[in-house]
């Protein structure tokens, strides 16, 4: 490489300058940010993979120490969570995108689906109150894998009457079929691709505050793309113009 590479940075080793504060415990993550008189949210989640919500009784939780408010899906009829990546099927039709409310409405569709949120003066108070919420479920048959999902399984989202989000592929099916038909031997094997998830040091987190004087929100959250969060939250969740919502991404632990 020519001598100019070190000066331009192209082809040269780039020295990191941010490691010292992380190695010495001086990172600034979302959980490190605290605001005056802040409250805490704790989600009550479904233990079932597929079930109807019959009733939610939060009366005992409402009377619990430190509780500020309790919300369920009935309180969030507007402002769902949009899909950030749109895909079209091979025939050009858009993918099915059923509603994705912040809290389950009438039905849970996976273990851990959010059923209620408790707002309290401390995280311990919120957790304690959530344990007092009584949810009655009608458990439904779960859809556990893709093959079962197509074989007459119950619909996870009844309003779209299918368990297939989109039909998309690559390659030449006719050429593949011909190659298999002309082969001397054909071996078939079922391969299951396991679910993958990164084990980040920091889970999803957010802290937000509202300025009554300016009617503006500020959100601190774990994100590598705060501009997209501002766009989606403003347009689809909070129905706010972007200039009324400020999203700050501090250090991200994953």
What is the role of each PLM region?
Residues 70, 170-179:
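Predominantly extracellular/luminal regions of secreted and cell-surface proteins
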Residues 1-162:
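Flexible, low-hydrophobicity surface segments
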Residues 40, 109-111, 209-218, 252-253:
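Short, surface-exposed connector motifs at secondary-structure boundaries
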Residues 76, 223-226, 251-253:
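Acidic, glycine-rich active-site loops and adjacent beta-strand->loop/helix elements
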Residues 176-238:
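Conserved beta-alpha junction segments in alpha/beta enzyme cores
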Residues 36, 241-244:
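ATP-dependent carbohydrate kinase catalytic cores
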Residues 243-251:
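Beta-strand segments within the central parallel beta-sheet cores of soluble alpha/beta enzyme folds
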């Amino acid at each position: 490489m020519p001598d100019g590479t070190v000066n331009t940075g192209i082809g040269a080793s780039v020295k990191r300058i941010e490691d010292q504060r992380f190695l010495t415990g001086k990172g600034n993550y979302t959980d490190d940010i605290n605001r005056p008189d802040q409250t805490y949210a704790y989600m009550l989640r479904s233990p079932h993979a597929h079930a109807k919500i019959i009733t939610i009784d939060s009366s005992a939780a409402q009377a619990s120490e430190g509780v500020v408010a309790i919300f369920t899906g009935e309180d969030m009829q507007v402002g769902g969570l949009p899909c950030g990546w749109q895909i079209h099927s091979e025939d050009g039709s858009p993918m099915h995108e059923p509603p994705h409310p912040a809290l389950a409405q009438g039905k849970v569709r996976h273990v851990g689906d959010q059923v209620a949120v408790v707002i309290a003066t401390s995280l311990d108070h919120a957790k304690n109150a959530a344990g007092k919420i009584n949810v009655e479920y009608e458990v439904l048959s779960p859809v556990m894998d893709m093959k079962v999902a197509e074989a007459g399984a119950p619909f996870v989202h009844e309003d779209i009457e299918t368990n297939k989000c989109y039909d998309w592929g690559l390659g030449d099916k006719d050429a593949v079929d011909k190659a298999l038909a002309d082969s001397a031997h054909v071996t078939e094997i079922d391969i299951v691709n396991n679910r993958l998830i990164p084990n980040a040091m920091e889970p999803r987190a957010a802290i937000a505050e509202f300025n009554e004087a300016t009617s503006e929100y500020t959100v601190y959250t774990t994100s590598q793309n705060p501009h997209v969060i501002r766009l989606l939250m403003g347009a689809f969740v909070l129905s706010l113009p972007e200039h009324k919502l400020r999203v700050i991404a501090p250090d991200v632990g994953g």
